[in-house]
Structure formats: C-alpha cells, structure tokens
A protein has these predicted regions:
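A conserved position within tetratricopeptide repeats
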Residues: 115-118, 152
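Alpha-helical solenoid repeat scaffolds, predominantly canonical TPR units
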Residues: 106, 113, 146-150
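N-terminal alpha-helical interaction modules that lie
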Residues: 24-107, 168-236
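Residue-level recognition of tetratricopeptide repeat
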Residues: 123-124, 158
Length: 236
C-alpha cells in the first residue's frame, strides 16, 4: 500500500510534466533500442539522426515527443557517444556557479563552460540549466526560450520511460550523470547512496527528504553498461 501511495503521488507530478507532450501516447514506455537504432541510422527514416540533431540544435518548436525520444536514446549509436562524465569543464562550470554574485565576465565564463560541455554531451542538463540561469539574468528572452525547449526535450525523453519507483519501471538514461541532473526536475535531492543492483542494468539513487515520501529512484543504465562492456570495461 505504501508503494502504491508513493507511485500515485509521483504519477500526479509526472502527469503535469508530461501531459502536453504525451497526451496521445502510452504514459510510460521503455525505449525499444533495436527499433530506435534502425530508425536513426536509416537515411530514409523520418527519425534519421542528423535530421533530429539539427532540429534539436536549432530548438525547433515543432519537434515531437517521439522525435525527442529517438534523439536522446539514438545518441548511443552515434560516434560521439561517451557515457562517462569526466570532462574538466564540469569543474570549471561548478566553480563559476559557486560564486555568491556574478559579474559580466562570470556570465561569459559560465556560457563558455556550458557550451564546451554541450559539445561533448548535447543533453547535459547541468549545462542547459547554467545557460538558462545566465539568460534569465541577462533578460535574453529568445535565447532562454531556445534552451528551455532543448531542456524540455531531454527531460520528457527520460521521464516518459517509467515512473522510477521500482527496478521494473525505471527511468532510462544514457549517462549516469543524467540521473543526478533529472532529480531536481522531479522535486528530489540526492540522498547519498548510488547502488547498482547485482546482475542487473538498473541502479538506484537514494533521496533526501521529500514531500512524496519517496526513498529512492530507479534508473535503467543499460546503454551505459553495454557501451562500457563492449569497450573492455571501465568506469561508468
């Protein structure tokens, strides 16, 4: 009963997030990676990856939820896909954002670090959030709207895959870092524990105290595990 109550609370939150994007679709649906791979690698497909990426980079307001899903999960089949998150620009961005007040040069530095991260990972939510912070402070409405649309595409792709309440209904992500980055969007904070379930491609993050009473959120990291395994193992 307790699990059901928590699930209903989270579904209430997610329904507000996803209603406009997924009103005509099944509420949650795990990604079909085999189908996505066929679609994004076929030049005759409406989901051909270069076309989707161009739409995303130009922040096309007409990009559909299915296109967003293919864009995000189809990235694992692109040469630039690297599931690890070890860029030095993460540190530079964190340092720039840690200031109590910002100068115009600070804003420039934040944007430079964010753009550098997005070159390595176009779906880096931390970088997108950092750009939104700067554009809001600069009252740059057009730039803010563009980045906000990009962030929404990434968020919808992730939260449309499950409810995160169990290992059977996890959120799917293509980078472990995206787990942490999606938590604030869901109304959560990280509680300090990150555990991969034995013999599985699912892990969970424990949560800080929250109004839903949820203790942990589950994520499927199969793209990460598969990529690392195919390259001889290593850090995820």
């Amino acid at each position: 009963m307790k699990h059901i109550q928590k699930t209903l609370l989270v579904l209430t939150l997610l329904s507000g997030i996803l209603f406009s994007a997924h009103a005509q679709e099944e509420f949650f649906k795990a990604p079909d990676f085999a189908q996505i791979k066929r679609d994004v690698t076929s030049s005759s497909s409406s989901y051909y990856y270069p076309t989707l990426l161009e739409k995303y980079m130009t922040s096309d307001a007409m990009m559909t939820p299915q296109e967003g899903r293919h864009l995000y999960f189809g990235y694992v089949y692109q040469p630039g896909y690297v599931p690890t998150d070890t860029s030095s620009h993460n540190t530079l961005l964190a340092e720039a954002l840690s200031r109590k007040s910002f100068t115009p040069q600070d804003y420039t530095n934040i944007l430079q670090s964010a753009d550098a991260l997005l070159l390595e990972d176009p779906f880096n939510l931390r970088a997108l959030n950092a750009k939104l912070l700067v554009y809001a402070q600069q009252n740059n409405t057009e730039a803010y709207k563009k980045v906000a649309r990009q962030r929404r595409i990434v968020q919808d792709a992730i939260v449309g895959t499950g409810d995160g309440m169990s290992e059977k209904t996890p959120f799917y992500v293509i980078k472990v870092a995206h787990e942490y980055d999606i938590l604030p969007f869901l109304g959560y904070t990280f509680g300090g524990e990150d555990k991969i379930l034995k013999g599985n491609k699912v892990n969970y993050l424990s949560l800080g105290e929250n109004r839903f009473g949820v203790e942990r959120v589950y994520f499927n990291i199969s793209p990460v595990v598969d990529h690392v395994s195919s390259h001889g193992g290593g850090k995820m």
